[in-house]
Structures are given as C-alpha cells and as structure tokens.
Amino acid sequence: MQHQPLQIEPIPAFEDNYIWLLHNTRDAIVIDPGDAAPVLASLKTKKLTLSAILITHHHADHIGGVASLLESYSVPVYAPSYEQFPFNHIAVTEGEIIDLTQFDLKFQVMWLPGHTLGHIAFVSEAYLFCGDVLFSAGCGRLFEGTPAQMLASLNRLKKLPADTQVYCTHEYTGKNIDFALTLEPENQALFDRKQAVSQLRKDNKPSLPSTIALELSTNPFLRCNQSSIIRHAEVTEADELTVFTKIRLLRNHY
C-alpha cells in the first residue's frame, strides 16, 4: 500500500502553544493536545480520522484535551512511563519504538528529564518532537529537574543529525532570540535569525520548525562553551554546567 506524504501542521492553542498535527490526508496523530476544541475543528475541516495521541509530559497545557478527544476517538495514547495521567495510556520510555505503520513512521522515545522528571521526546530519522525540553533558541524552565539533568538532556539532542527538524510546543522564538543576543551580541547568525523570525511572525506564520543545525548556531543553552556567553554570563567558573545554570536563571528573569 502506497503511503501519502506526511504533512505536519501546527494547531495554535491558548496564548502560545502549538499542538502538532501529523496526517496523510486521511489519518492523523496529534502531539500534546492541551485543548480538544481546535483539534476537533481541524480534524473535521480536513476530514481526518484521529489514530493516535502522543504526550511528552504531564503539564495541563499539553494534556488538557486528551479526555475529550478520547470521547470521540478510541485511540492509543502514548505517554511517559515516569509520570501520572488521568486517562488510560500506553507508558513508554527510553529506547522504545512507536511504529505508526499507516504513516510509514517510527518514533524512538528519548527520556529527557529537566523540565519535568519524566519528560520524553519522540524522534524519527527526520523529526524531533521535544515538548518543552528544547525550544527554538531556548529551553524549558526547570520545574522538577536539576540543571545537570536538563543540560544532559540538551547535550543528547545536540548529537542528533544536523538536519533534524525540531518541533517544540511554544511560540517563544522571538523573545528567546532577544535574550540570546544579550549573551552573544556579535553572533551574526542570531541577527539573521531575528530578521527571519520577525518576518514570519509579521506574516502570522509560526517560527517553527527549527533544525538542530540552526539551534547549534543560535541557541545559547546549546552553546555554553562559547567565550562570549561565558563572559556575558559573568560566572566565576567557566564549566558548562555553571554557565548553563546561570543563563537559565538569567532567562527566568528576562
């Protein structure tokens, strides 16, 4: 059976969330549906049938729509093993494979603690759906994990192929770039990205997806060993963890 090309579209929710819709013009997957209403509307408009739900972590803005979706569609929900959920789900963790045959797509689960302790991401040959771990030009706040855990998680993502498309779940790119420029005011890649993102947002388009290559050149949380960042962070020790911890704190108050 020939598979239709996979299409990936953001469904905007709340103030700045993206619920990711993956479909082949017939069947669909949603990732982190914090709100059911826009998902149901999109499925109806596009004449799609929901076939699976993927969850990266337990925060309400990522799972709030699951119960309502399950009332309309009896589908599997894949969610982190190390977190609790108020709905039936298939618990998955590090190294497990989710085989979505109707999309000719396989996701490997990565356990990436930091934002929450059980946070997972879904990675394929071409795509990374990383919830609130890696943001476009930023990273998630440390609600449950330690700086060391988050840094280790981000360092794992740095090793993915450079052309991997990065799909996170918040439209934070503009402010993240502005913060990054306080640490690397001479980084031309950041200025170029700021201009590109400003135009996208002006046109009411998402700034996502990013790529691992783009993040490596513009995301300060993946660049803690850069001399400019070390200098502007004003740390007494220049090791990667100390720098990461400081700039995460600076971003919290930016």
Give the residues covered by each predicted segment.
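Active-site-adjacent loop/tail segments of enzyme domains
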Residues: G138-T164
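Accessory terminal helices/loops
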Residues: N155-Q165, G174-Y254
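Conserved beta-strand hairpin/beta-sheet module of binuclear metal-dependent hydrolase folds
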Residues: M1-L48, I120-L134
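Divalent metal-coordination and catalytic microenvironments
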Residues: L22, D32, H57, L69, ...
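A short acidic, helix-capping loop that chelates divalent metal ions and anchors anionic groups
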Residues: F85-F87, A137-F143, N176
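Core dinuclear metal-dependent hydrolase active-site scaffold
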Residues: L21, I97-V123, K159
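Active-site HxH/HxHxD metal-binding segment of metal-dependent hydrolases
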Residues: F14, A28, D35-M110, D192, ...
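Active-site metal-binding loops of divalent metal-dependent hydrolases
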Residues: P33-D35, H58, Y82-E83, H115-T116, ...
